[in-house]
Amino acid sequence: MPRLHSASEPPATGFFARVRNELGNRTEGLHQINNQALDWYRSQSQIRQILIQIGGVVAIVIGVLVLIFHKYLIELLVIISDDWAKLPGGRLILFLLVFFVGFPPLIGYSALSLLAGMVYGFPYGWPLLASASVSGSFVAFLVFRYFLRSQGERLVNSNEKFRAFAEILREDSSLFLLVLIRLCPLPYSLSNGALAAIPELSAWVYLGASVITSPKMLIHLFVGHKIKEFGDAKTDTSTKIIDVISILVTGAAASLTTFIIYRKMQQKLHHNRAGANYDAFVFGNFDDLESGTNVELNSADFDQDNFIITDDELEEEEPNGSHTATATQVQVARRNCSKAMTICTLMFV
């Protein structure tokens, strides 16, 4: 006779089971994102829906043109990078562009980083890119911390990743933890404003984490430098193949590293949430107690066998004046008794 599946049985822990669960979670996540996107689109006005459709068509056309004319596009980028290198004040212009793109909701950080690699090479463009990025991020952090705090809080609430990392940083705002978060694949400018809304996070810790993680910009510089070499007509075919392989390997290694770090952070977040729920189960949740009420229990709240006095016992004994416990004290005492019984039960399970 076949054995029926029990809900109490532990889930499968094999490799294929983990892969299946991971694929199921990813599929469910994509389905939720699709539903959210559809709901957001349907909530827009008719004019905005038309504009969104036009923008989608334009994006598709641009993507097709890039695939067809990518060779000419790369050659154009090479020409622009050569002219930029000869431009008076070119370093200052690129510095200011990277500096201000650190303010949300501006975009273009990755493109500017690649441009720095194409113009100034690898690793010679790192001092310019790192100084502009670190200073811009720090100034954006200070602006959103002291002047645009409400906008930063909205950024946190608008993104699930930001909410998750904010929950972790409220419990542990150490430099090491922030370094791991800065290495995660988060939107560059938006993360600067969102992290500023966490009061437990020190500005100096944020600056230190930005400086420590600045070497990751070498990846953008390397890719930009190789793209320029790939578009150079003087480069032979074998060198171009090596450049393409190096770009793919570098991108895959960087993506794998950030994915591993992100997974570790997700596991830490899950562990923290599970620990909080377990503590609430064992010790109760005191959020529902009225604020400002000081409850003190004394020996009058218990009988000679250390059992909590009930309401009926109070009604019987209050006329004699032997006990003075209030209703609030009795309620808290009952709650303490239930917690004690829960703890005892867990100790013997």
UniProtKB/Swiss-Prot annotation:
Pfam families: VTT_dom. The chain crosses the membrane at residues 50-70, 92-112, 124-144, 193-213, 241-261. Residues 71-91, 145-192, 262-349 are cytoplasmic. Residues 117-227 are annotated as: VTT domain. GO terms for cellular component: Golgi membrane. It is a multi-pass membrane protein. Keywords: Glycoprotein, Golgi apparatus, Membrane, Transmembrane, Transmembrane helix. Glycans are attached at N25. Belongs to the TVP38/TMEM64 family. Golgi membrane protein involved in vesicular trafficking and spindle migration. The VTT domain was previously called the SNARE-assoc domain. As there is no evidence that this domain associates with SNARE proteins, it was renamed as VMP1, TMEM41, and TVP38 (VTT) domain. This is Golgi apparatus membrane protein TVP38. It comes from Meyerozyma guilliermondii (strain ATCC 6260 / CBS 566 / DSM 6381 / JCM 1539 / NBRC 10279 / NRRL Y-324) (Yeast).
